[in-house]
From Swiss-Prot:
The gene is proA. InterPro entries: Ald_DH/histidinol_DH (IPR016161), Ald_DH_C (IPR016163), Ald_DH_N (IPR016162), Aldehyde_DH_dom (IPR015590), G-glutamylP_reductase_CS (IPR020593), Glu-5-SA_DH (IPR012134), GPR_dom (IPR000965). Pfam families: Aldedh (PF00171). GO terms for cellular component: cytoplasm. GO terms for biological process: L-proline biosynthetic process. Belongs to the gamma-glutamyl phosphate reductase family. This is Gamma-glutamyl phosphate reductase. HAMAP family: ProA. Catalyzes the NADPH-dependent reduction of L-glutamate 5-phosphate into L-glutamate 5-semialdehyde and phosphate. The product spontaneously undergoes cyclization to form 1-pyrroline-5-carboxylate. Its EC number is 1.2.1.41. It catalyses: L-glutamate 5-semialdehyde + phosphate + NADP(+) = L-glutamyl 5-phosphate + NADPH + H(+). The lineage of its organism: Bacteria, Pseudomonadati, Pseudomonadota, Gammaproteobacteria, Vibrionales. Its main location: cytoplasm.
């Protein structure tokens, strides 16, 4: 399979999408949302095949949870698309403007990026999220999902293609690479004549491979160790609720809690509270000081090298006792704090130190790490959570899928 023709078709579609009206794009999105619900039986049947094959292949519970669709999740995906409809279309909006001394009116106007290539793994919802956000912003997209989601994605792509046809938008606006051959990923990463940005959504290995092999700009994100530090001044009862929510609400999510750091002055009180609340679900991986205070835990083991660098994506939690906020920050710097990190504290000084010192895409004071999400941030769905510093950072919504062009208007002005 040669992806060159797919790239050419996407580039052609991108030119048409760039001038599509907001009403036309919203029409396509409304059809996608409605048909997701109307075709739920077929979509869920296809997803059941993927789940069955995933179990046979020995996928972890975390991966199976990411792969799973049910009526509730499908309705949520449809509603996310409807939320995108309600958002302002950034394309064509002015960022700023001024009048130069020579009389020229100069402005910066938002424009689509062009063609976005997205490589992702066992998350069928990403197929719809990407398609919706790219369509809203006038971008064409080339999608490559994992083999684990093959049957689910085939049904979802049918919904998208039906919507494009009914809204009179080019079929190549959203294309899907059906074959799971990794060689096709390598091809996609070299289509710099046609593709303007690559977004990998998966583990560290996928991000590394894209970064090292792509001739197209790559957005790195989604991977990072998420921490919560419980300071000595924190309200421990309220902190307990936040820690539990961050860990167990959806442990397979990239913004779920990986490592809990506790100030040594409150560890003797707080860690037994954690054990009592969470030990029926969570396996603790603890360094010696923490383990000594968690004697009642039913599932606990000693932390070994590499544990605090692990994104668990499961009901496993690293635990460590630290001397103060500075040691907590130092730990985060060493152990890949780049995604979502939080401090529980009633100290303004410590909260500001944390905000200014932790280099993550999203930092929180007295809030769960689970909030790093496009919908939670009011962005609609998201194409990714970027953990790099250039172009976009954190949940990438509509504006992050645009660039800008300079627009100069004058009265037949020539440069002197």
């Amino acid at each position: 399979m040669d992806l060159t023709n797919m790239g050419k078709a996407a580039k052609g579609a991108a030119f048409e999408l760039a001038t599509a009206s907001t009403a036309q794009k919203n029409q396509a999105l409304a059809i996608i949302a409605d048909e997701l619900e109307a075709n739920s039986a077929a979509i869920l049947a296809a997803n059941a095949k993927d789940i069955e094959l995933g179990r046979e292949a020995g996928l972890t519970d975390a991966l199976l949870d990411r792969l799973l669709l049910n009526e509730e999740r499908l309705t949520g995906i449809a509603n996310d698309v409807r939320n995108v409809i309600s958002l302002n279309d950034p394309v064509g909006s002015e960022i700023d403007s001024k009048v130069l001394e020579n009389g020229m009116s100069l402005s910066r106007r938002r424009v689509p990026l062009g063609v976005v290539g997205v490589i992702y793994e066992a998350r069928p919802n990403v197929t719809i999220d990407i398609a919706a956000l790219c369509l809203k912003t006038g971008n064409a997209s080339i999608l490559r999902g994992g083999k684990e989601t093959f049957f689910s994605n085939m049904e979802l792509v049918k919904v998208i293609q039906s919507a494009l046809a009914k809204a009179n938008l080019p079929a190549a606006s959203v294309q899907y690479i059906e074959k799971p051959d990794r060689e096709l990923v390598s091809q996609l990463l070299k289509l710099d004549d046609y593709v303007d940005m690559i977004i990998p959504r998966g583990g560290a290995g996928l991000h590394k491979m894209c970064k090292e092999n792509s001739t197209i700009p790559v957005i790195i994100g989604g991977f990072g160790i998420s921490h919560i530090f419980v300071d000595e001044s924190a309200d421990l009862e309220k902190s307990l609720n936040v820690v539990e929510n961050s860990k167990v609400q959806r442990p397979s999510a990239c913004n779920s809690l990986d490592t809990l750091l506790v100030h040594e002055k409150v560890a003797a009180k707080f860690l037994p509270m954690i054990v009592e609340r969470m030990s029926d679900k969570v396996t603790f991986v603890a360094e010696p000081k923490a383990k000594a205070l968690m004697a009642q835990a039913t599932q606990i083991r000693d932390a070994v090298e590499g544990d605090f660098d692990t994104e668990w994506l499961s009901y496993t939690l690293g635990v460590k006792v630290v001397a103060d906020v500075k040691e907590a920050i130092d730990h985060m710097r060493v152990h890949n704090a780049s995604h979502s990190d939080a401090i529980m504290t009633n100290s303004l000084i410590n909260s500001e130190l944390f905000i200014n010192s932790v280099g993550s895409a999203a930092v929180y004071v007295n809030a769960a790490t689970r909030f790093t999400d496009g919908a939670q941030f009011g962005l609609g769905a998201e194409v990714a959570v970027s953990t790099q510093k250039l172009h976009a950072r954190g949940p990438m919504g509509l504006e992050e899928l645009t660039s800008y062009k300079w627009v100069g208007k004058a009265n037949y002005l020539a440069r002197s």
